């Protein structure tokens, strides 16, 4: 669509009276408190109830938009479980269409991962009992309904899932949820002039919006004590990757990736966060200065005006979160720990190598997803070497496994990427060492898929059978 002189003059008129109407281009200058999802914990064998339903949410001040969510709110509660627990979930689908749910990064057998075989029709329930046997990590739950994942996650069926263990409990790092330990769920959307999310599937690639949201809020701030603050970052966007940095150039101290703690903290000035990827960072607020996390350059005024007339992929604001220190004493006063975990040595050698190709068109290795086809058969307790290539840069995820990144386009991975992972950004070629720790079965296979949700919906999914160890 061309941007004519008439449209520019119309837009100029709109801009003059922007203060009178709630336009998205005006939202970047307004800050609101960070919404912190309620904490839902497993206690003494009691089930965790998760109701999938319609709700309303305010993305812009003074408006309430129809959305989907869990337990009556946009997105869902933060779930916290402990290693060694057997957690009973009760999903209840109160929406008018079929939904399946999964916990991405959870290491459980295939029948407990969700997917087509665990589809919930309207008013149906699913009640898995999940054995939590993995180390502390930040995971996330979300819809993974075939051909509908992108729309359903965009609508609000997602949330954070925390696994804790004895190590995470005793490390001298912030662990008071909502006080010095915060979930930060990053998404991009496109809002109409009344603050209602708009979604239209792109002709190719994945959806990219122009409005940045954190926990469902634009340009949020949070008041913190003067000390260490822990932020659990999740990219829950459909396809957008973020490059995060601090507004004053101070370091981000990365302590954890998808599958748990790094051996030691890694200090970086810029941090990549791919769709589906999770990272935990510590920020030092001792000096008492307000600081923000940002993700690049915001749209210019011309780009904003253009956005009134055609969909835009340029973010109106790139402000992720502002940290405002208060006079409160810090709960954690220790120095940054030198070590978080002992260095693990990989035992055993890869038993085989595989090539995985993600093209511009939907499909993996030239084949669209087929619920009746198993693409990979492996053995529980073994390692394999996967070489994953992508013509179009995209995020890639494997269910039911942990992997280490061996190299990225022939070079060593960055230090912050040298821990256990389940999601990786592929721009060219990455080589992974994949460990099969959980079994799956033909009717309950694990997925490996593009984490560009629209590409997955169009068929960029493979199915994996992991035979149980004898």
UniProtKB/Swiss-Prot annotation:
Name this protein carries in UniProt: Cell division protein FtsP
Name of the gene: ftsP
Protein localization: Periplasm
Record's comment on post-translational modification: Predicted to be exported by the Tat system. The position of the signal peptide cleavage has not been experimentally proven.
Keywords: Cell cycle, Cell division, Periplasm, Signal
One Pfam family matching this protein: Cu-oxidase_3
Organism whose genome encodes this protein: Salmonella typhimurium (strain LT2 / SGSC1412 / ATCC 700720)
HAMAP family reported for this sequence: FtsP (MF_00915)
NCBIfam families: PRK10883.1, TAT_signal_seq
Highest taxon listed in the record's lineage: Bacteria
Gene Ontology molecular function terms on file: copper ion binding; oxidoreductase activity
